[in-house]
C-alpha cells in the first residue's frame, strides 16, 4: 500500500484549520493538529481537532507510514509559530519529503520560510516544496475570510502536494 500524505498543523484562530479541513479530501490525507506547547521542555499536546484528526502519543511515531509530510503553520510578525518550531525539534524526518505551507497576511514570508526550512532540514527531511497561503487579505481581518478564500488557498496547496505525489510515481 502506498504511503499517504500527512498534514501536521497548528492553528490558533482557526484559519489554518479551515484550510486543512478543505484540503484533506482533495489529497486524501490524514491530519494531526499540534496543541499548545507546555512547560519549559516544550512538550507538545497533540490531539483531536476534528473527526479526521487522530490522537497521537508522540512525534517520533507519527510520520513513519506517511509521505509526504505537509507542515502548516501561521506566520506571526514574520516568524513561524513557536509551536511548529518546538515540534520540529522533537521529530525524526529522515528521508521524508516535506511540503511547507505558511499561512499569513503577506504574499511571501522569506524569513519564516527560511527558519522553518532550516529546522526541517536539521531533522533530516528531503525538502521538496513551499507554498505561501493568504490567511488574511490586504486591508482585511482574518474574520473577513469567506469560503471561497479558504478554497482558493486549499487548492494552491493541493496543486503542490499533487505534483509531489505525481513525481514519486
What is the predicted function of each stretch?
Residues 65, 94, 126-127:
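Short loop/turn motifs at secondary-structure junctions
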Residues 126-169:
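A charged, well-structured terminal subsegment
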Residues 89-96, 121-123:
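Short, conserved loop/helix-junction motifs that constitute active-site signature segments
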Amino acid at each position: 500500500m502506498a504511503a499517504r500524505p500527512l498534514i501536521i498543523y497548528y492553528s490558533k484562530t482557526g484559519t489554518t484549520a479551515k484550510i486543512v479541513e478543505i484540503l484533506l479530501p482533495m489529497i486524501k490525507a490524514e491530519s494531526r493538529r499540534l496543541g499548545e506547547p507546555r512547560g519549559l521542555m516544550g512538550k507538545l499536546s497533540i490531539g483531536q481537532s476534528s473527526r479526521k484528526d487522530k490522537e497521537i502519543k508522540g512525534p517520533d511515531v507519527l510520520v513513519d507510514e506517511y509521505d509526504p509530510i505537509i507542515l502548516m503553520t501561521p506566520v506571526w510578525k514574520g516568524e513561524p509559530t513557536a509551536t511548529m518550531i518546538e515540534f520540529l525539534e522533537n521529530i525524526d524526518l529522515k528521508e521524508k519529503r516535506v511540503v511547507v505551507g505558511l499561512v499569513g497576511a503577506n504574499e511571501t514570508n522569506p524569513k519564516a520560510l527560511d527558519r522553518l526550512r532550516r529546522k526541517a532540514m536539521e531533522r533530516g527531511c528531503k525538502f521538496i516544496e513551499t507554498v505561501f497561503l493568504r490567511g488574511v487579505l490586504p486591508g482585511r481581518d482574518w474574520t473577513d475570510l469567506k469560503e471561497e478564500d479558504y478554497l482558493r488557498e486549499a487548492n494552491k496547496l493541493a496543486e503542490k502536494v499533487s505534483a509531489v505525489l505525481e513525481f514519486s510515481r
